Amino acid sequence: MFSKSGMSDLMKHAQRMQEQMQQMQGEIAKLEVNGESGAGLVKVTINGVYHCRRVEIDSSLLQDDKDMLEDLITAAFNDAVRRITEIKKDKMTSLSSSLQMPLGFNWNMPFL
């Protein structure tokens, strides 16, 4: 099946991949991304593990209807999640190309 040197090379490659993955996950966790809605009237900042760090609401909205404000906050949060997801996908694509993974390898892993 595998020669000893082939197995050793495979294990070294797997170890290197694991180290790079852990480093990337640490970098992603430190990221902060802003999501916006209502033309910037509501802003939500989340980190790379989707924890909400900050919510900013323009004072002009405080007199408006509660339902609309809730919708804008939800939309801003979802925008931030979309942005962080794109960043993660880009980083995984970059990592996979540097590791020479097989063509078509799927990085959609639940732990990312």
Curated annotation (Swiss-Prot):
InterPro entries: YbaB-like_sf, YbaB/EbfC. One of its GO terms (cellular component) is bacterial nucleoid. Pfam families: YbaB_DNA_bd. It is found in: Cytoplasm, Nucleoid. The keyword Electron transport does not apply. Its main location: cytoplasm. Homodimer. This is Nucleoid-associated protein BCI_0116. It comes from Baumannia cicadellinicola subsp. Homalodisca coagulata. The lineage of its organism: Bacteria, Pseudomonadati, Pseudomonadota, Gammaproteobacteria, Candidatus Palibaumannia.
